[in-house]
Amino acid sequence: MTKVITRFAPSPTGMLHVGNIRVALLNWLYAKKHNGKFILRFDDTDLERSKQKYKNDIERDLKFLNINCDQIFNQLSRVSRYNEIKNLLINKKRLYACYETTEELELKRKFRLSKGLPPIYDRASLNLTEKQIQKYIEQGRKPHYRFFLNDEPISWYDMIKGDIKYNGKALSDPIVIRADGSMTYMLCSVIDDIDYDITHIIRGEDHVSNTAIQIQMFEALNKIPPVFAHLSLIINKEEKISKRVGGFEIAYLKNEVGLEAMTITSFFSLLGSSLHIFPYKSIEKLVAQFEISSFSKSPTIYQQYDLERLNHKLLISLDYHEVKERLKEINADYIDENFWLSVRANLQKLSDIKDWWDICYQTPKIGNLNLDKEYLKQASELLPLGKITKDSWSIWTKEITNATGRKGKELFLPIRLALTGRKSGPEIAGILPLLKREEIIKRLVAIT
């Protein structure tokens, strides 16, 4: 049986966003599910926009999300190979030179649209005489090259969308070599997929028409195309996600929102599938449950709130030994197991635990809360004697109710505010043993 090999091929022209990290995750998961290989390829043929900084950022983000790459390469290192295939396809008359300027092509496009015709290239360059070509050369024009698409049906089976059919006549011959001699993504990608034995390609549905074109490129090179799967796009506020829309970058979700790696990995590995989005603690468990057939054809809605809520669920589920190393990473290795278990249910992000440590072990900022001083003084006098434990709260509240008649919010909110300066937070029963008797009385009396 052929070994499964997948790839993730970002252009290093910006930071990873939620749309392309989802593609990376699903390709990685599919490869690992089938004991295969995952390749990272940088599509860096756009010399003007591709930056080494973005390559570094992409590798950093993948590492953060526990996506390990079995192989990494960039397209710039393979230019001689691309030129070899370029010459082969020119000789086979599947690549042809064109001399139109950008302005001329735009005029042609507008003209066809005005006539109700699809804006595809008219292949005028195929009818140029030697004299016309020589004139263009004398004018200083340099040719760009297009791939000649056969006017025949193109069909394939998609792992998500099922049977897909295109008519070659409805597609425009794509530019594969620019006038400056640089290669576009379209042909380079096919050459790489052939040379690196890529068996499966999972990508966004905005690439469906590219797939139709690339299938003819595979066939022109006498190769069998990989198996394709096209994911529905991630939609936020009726817009598809792109690297040019701010706030969706992985670095932002990690550093600004404070999300855990497994929150992001769990969410985007399951988003758009029929499987329940669950905060997995390890990526190995995600691999075990992954099924490409579970993904829907329908558009996928993304809301950052859902990610933040999942992060909260993940933190609640983590035992101390599972979070100890992460606490060191955020310089909070002073947090012990007892404190973690007492406050984890109230953490939206891991760094929140520092705030709760400060609240418990430094004087909280109470502000002008206009609390009932007489009530707090009376409550301090009713605090149970002896060592403060989690059971002390229930004993204390009974004493307060018997003495004052207060219950519920009227009873606990003034005490919570006096002790923590917050209207919400961890169960007071768990906070009391952390504060201890002297500090509890001190904070209640300080209000009075």
Swiss-Prot record:
Motif 'KMSKS' region mapped to chain: 240-244
Cell compartment(s), UniProt: Cytoplasm
Chain location of the short sequence motif 'HIGH' region per the record: 10-20
Enzyme class: ligase
One matching Pfam family: tRNA-synt_1c
Top-level taxon of origin: Bacteria
GO CC annotation, single: cytoplasm
Residues binding ATP, per UniProt: K243
Molecular function, one GO term: ATP binding
Keywords recorded for this protein, A-Z: Aminoacyl-tRNA synthetase, ATP-binding, Cytoplasm, Ligase, Nucleotide-binding, Protein biosynthesis
InterPro entries: aa-tRNA-synth_I_cd-bd, aa-tRNA-synth_I_codon-bd_sub2, aa-tRNA-synth_I_CS, aa_tRNA-synth_I_cd-bd_sf, Glu-tRNA-ligase_bac/mito, Glu/Gln-tRNA-synth, Glu/Gln-tRNA-synth_Ib_cat-dom, GluQ/Sye
EC number of the protein: 6.1.1.17
One example of a Gene Ontology biological process annotation: glutamyl-tRNA aminoacylation
Keyword Ligase: yes
Catalysed reaction, written as an equation: tRNA(Glu) + L-glutamate + ATP = L-glutamyl-tRNA(Glu) + AMP + diphosphate
PANTHER family assigned to the protein according to its UniProt record, in alphabetical order: GLUTAMATE--TRNA LIGASE (PTHR43311), GLUTAMATE--TRNA LIGASE, MITOCHONDRIAL-RELATED (PTHR43311:SF2)
Assembly information from the UniProt record: Monomer.
Entries under HAMAP family matching the protein: Glu_tRNA_synth_type1 (MF_00022)
NCBIfam families: gltX_bact
Protein family membership: Belongs to the class-I aminoacyl-tRNA synthetase family. Glutamate--tRNA ligase type 1 subfamily.
Function comment: Catalyzes the attachment of glutamate to tRNA(Glu) in a two-step reaction: glutamate is first activated by ATP to form Glu-AMP and then transferred to the acceptor end of tRNA(Glu).
Descriptive protein name: Glutamate--tRNA ligase 1
